Amino acid sequence: MVGPDGMLPLPWLEATLRDTLLTRRAHALLLQGPRGVGQFDLAVTLAQAWLCEAASDAARPCGHCASCRLVLARSHPDLMVLLPEALREPLGWNLSDGDEAATDKASKAKPSKEIRVEAVRAAVSFAQVTSARGRCKVVVVHPAERMNDIAANTLLKTLEEPPGQARFVLACSEPEALLATIRSRCQAVPMRLPPAELATEWLTQRGLAEPAVLLAATGGQPQEVLDWVAQGLDAVLWQRIPALVRDGDHGPLTQMQLPRVVDALQKLCHDAACVAAGAAPRYFPAAAVPAGVDLLALVEWSRELDRAARHADHTWNAGLMVEALVLRGQRALTGAGVNAARSANPSGRAMRQGASVNSGP
């Protein structure tokens, strides 16, 4: 959102914001691009621009009119933001009426990662009511791929026959997970990774040490860097991961959440394969990635990591799974060979036990 100083919090969004406001006139937009580049920030800023009472000639929000202040305070009566319950607190948005209804039904369960149908129904009703401040009504959906099938079909009906004054902004990082019919009703706005220099400068301004290392760790996604750091990752630990795996030391990795550990190991596996093929690594410094890996063992490790990724959100036996994955990675990175990996019964049992626990009864 544009603040009273007229500045965007994510500077790399400036050109996309300007282009979208000047050229995209559809009632529904689909912001799509890699995670961590600011889809949600752009979606809310577009809503702010459409609701602004003193927009510039380029339709940019002023940041200081009454409507802009209401958007900044997350209390504009003509703006509804649909988020999974699990993202409400991290992003600082209160529950909508639909979210409250859904939450009352499952108050004892952990926060949902889905956008529920109750929230979408509330948004549909909201869009059909006359604007309170005379501009338009705006519904933001993020991440749009988190709508379950019922919720998505409920929204589709409104996108096909939109109320005259309503506009919709769907933000996502996995557009292929959306219904094809929803994608066809929206005008696409592609978003790309920001220039590394700009993203590194932005991270430096937030006090991060060695931001270039952390930016590479996330594949160039600056907002993902902040999430990783909040969960205990720093540049020193990241650069140690190849050596930790090579030495079979999983202990320091336990300070990271399991999905992050699996993701880090997948990136190490990718980079090890690149180095073995004579290409440059993408995620880790070249000097940190071991050479002389066993390619067959690396393939088996990659398959184990893919299986682990499907269960990474579960907490059962997380420590055992991390240990087993690191041991399998050690054999791949040290060139011990596939046969040695298969003959190592302790890690094999650990992986089977972890898979058995995660698969449920």
Predicted segment positions?
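Loop/turn-to-beta-strand initiation segments
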Residues: 133-138, 163-169
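Short N-terminal helix/helix-N-cap motif within the alpha/beta-hydrolase-1
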Residues: 149-152, 334
